[in-house]
Design a protein with these regions (language model features):
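HhH-family (HhH-GPD) DNA N-glycosylase catalytic core used in base-excision repair
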Residues: 1-268
């Protein structure tokens, strides 16, 4: 690892606690499996299987010219440089966003991890333990109603199965699309709406200008990072304010605000 950074975002449910730090296995489209480990501020990547390149990561910093809300700028600059890995698996990104719909962040992580442990591919780790990936679309399609219900996922059964069927048919094409085009394609799938499509593509591409930036997570952490600022209370007004405030820095401002939340709480 040669990146210079101060903070690594581990908000995705696939990051799991391990020996006082965090770890995540990335499943790449070329068949490679990579283990990312974060411990004592040190990030390491180990190839577990396959060949090909490492999972892609991007570094974000607060723009020097950003001064629209000084209190917010100060909070975000306290993070320093922030690293976030792109979700290498579009199917995982879709499934994660579906599980995250309309439930609390902490609960969505519990559901995601239990679902992975029960039905996901088990990847052997160097320490002798194993790591469970998100269940493949073929597996999801084969699960019974009772299997969903046993993990508290009954209300996610239909959207996950619809997404799995669509991914098996269109996934190869989707992975080649530009992020904004992919958003429209995803919304052609039953039960995938704007929030899910935008959140999925942001996770997959790290293009956070496409994230639904007026959602509860951004509103919550913007208000906590800059409590003295008079933020609009309702979602549409906040979205307009946020877009105007960010200008050309919408991607970095949104990601860094979520990173600030990741450092100070649980945003899912």
């Amino acid at each position: 690892m040669h990146d210079a950074f101060d903070f690594v975002m581990t908000e995705h449910a696939a990051w799991q606690q391990a020996d006082g730090g965090a770890q995540r296995v990335f499943a790449l489209n070329d068949g490679g499996r990579w283990l990312a480990t974060l411990q004592d501020g040190r990030l390491t990547l180990d190839r577990l299987s396959g060949a090909g390149v490492e999972p892609v990561r991007d570094v974000f910093t607060t723009p020097k010219v950003f001064a629209g809300v000084p209190e917010l700028a100060t909070s975000l600059r306290s993070l320093g440089s922030v690293v976030r890995f792109r979700n290498a698996d579009l199917w995982d990104a879709i499934g994660t966003s579906i599980i995250r719909q309309v439930i609390r962040a902490g609960q969505s992580k519990k559901l995601y991890r239990a679902f992975c442990r029960a039905h996901g591919e088990k990847v052997a780790l160097p320490d002798g333990n194993s790591y469970a990936l998100f269940p493949a679309p073929e597996v999801v399609l084969g699960l019974s109603d009772d299997q969903f219900s046993s993990h508290g996922m009954a209300f996610k059964r239909r959207p996950l199965k619809a997404a799995a069927e669509a991914y098996l048919e269109h996934g190869a094409k989707w992975r080649e699309l530009a992020p904004d085009t992919l958003i429209a394609e995803l919304q052609s799938v039953p039960r995938i709406g704007p929030w899910t499509a935008h959140a999925t593509v942001a996770d997959w591409s790290n293009e956070w200008s496409l994230y639904p930036y007026a959602d509860l997570a951004v509103r919550t952490w913007a208000k906590r990072a800059a409590p003295s600022h008079d933020w609009p209370a309702d979602e549409p007004a906040f979205g307009q304010t946020w877009r105007a405030l960010a200008g050309e820095h919408l991607c970095s401002l949104t990601l860094l605000t979520l990173a600030w939340g990741s450092q100070h709480g649980d945003i899912g």
